[in-house]
Regions:
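Structural marker of alpha-solenoid helical repeat scaffolds
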Residues: 31, 65, 109-110, 143-145, ...
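Canonical tetratricopeptide repeat
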Residues: 75-78, 119, 155, 189, ...
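Terminal, low-structured helical/coil segments at or just beyond the last alpha-helical repeat
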Residues: 222, 226-266
């Protein structure tokens, strides 16, 4: 009987030790999760203030603690993606590749949110892979409860623009605007589609709408100027082109517009 009691006592002691270890492990895991989320939130704050270097430092700290968190990987991808666009109008291909790698890593996680699919589709568009971009954006639209369909439809429309399928492109931009009527990208790209389809009056309207919702939208001013010029409305075209130069004086767009303005001199 003493032997039995001793063995039971030993078993209880070992089990108590296991419980204590598990509780300590859970507490440690929760603490790590909290620390990682703190870095993640700080990275988001830096990103919203365009402090990209500090944002990247913080999200890498979060990923050191939790390397498989889809939210952190998406944040890292966005930091790279924001830095793809260079002042002279060219793309930083290294950042573009890093953004794609981070999005692909995020998509390998079971809990990746649908926003990863749409943001990744943007990168695929920049890499001139429209068919893959369409697939990604369509996958996002199939996720129950996805609350930003306008962005997905806009990216699908841009993909069709790149493929030269203007009617399909216009259809998807209109769908985007059904969900979010004040989305400047959808208005601008619908203007491009209408221009290609020869529907210039509608194109002018859409470029004006894009500019109304985002007055600093350089591409929309450029598109407006071009279609106004096609319509023979030279004074209005000149005003649109001058706005391009004012908004982006050192860009390739501005250089091209300056040449066009020479032909508009009275």
């Amino acid at each position: 009987m003493k032997m039995i009691r001793r063995r039971v006592g030993i078993a209880w002691f070992l089990w108590a030790g296991v419980i204590a270890s598990l509780m300590g492990g859970c507490a440690s895991s929760k603490q790590i999760h909290t620390q990682a989320d703190d870095h993640y939130r700080l990275a988001q704050s830096y990103l919203s203030n365009e402090s990209n270097l500090l944002a990247e430092q913080e999200i890498r700290k979060a990923l050191t603690l939790r390397p498989d968190d889809a939210r952190y990987l998406e944040c890292l991808a966005l930091i790279h993606q924001i830095q793809v666009y260079q002042p002279q109008g060219t793309l930083n291909l290294t950042r573009l590749q890093l953004a794609e790698e981070a999005y692909r890593a995020a998509l390998r996680q079971a809990d990746a949110p649908p926003s990863v699919l749409v943001n990744y589709s943007t990168v695929l568009l920049l890499r001139e892979r429209p068919d893959e971009a369409i697939v990604m954006a369509q996958r996002a639209l199939q996720v129950p409860g996805y609350d930003q369909p306008a962005r997905a439809y806009t990216n699908i429309g841009i993909a069709y623009l790149k493929k030269g399928a203007l009617t399909q492109a216009a259809e998807h931009f209109r769908k985007a605007l059904d969900y979010q009527a004040n989305l400047p990208e959808a208005h601008h790209n619908l203007g491009i589609a209408y221009t290609g389809l020869g529907r210039r009056a509608e194109a002018i309207r859409e470029f004006h709408e894009a500019i109304r919702f985002r007055p600093s939208y350089v591409d929309a001013h450029l598109g407006l100027g071009k279609v106004l010029l096609e319509e023979g409305r030279k004074d209005e075209a000149r005003a649109a082109f001058e706005r391009v130069i004012a908004l982006a004086p050192g860009s390739d767009m501005a250089a091209g517009v300056r040449e066009q303005l020479k032909s508009l001199v009275p």
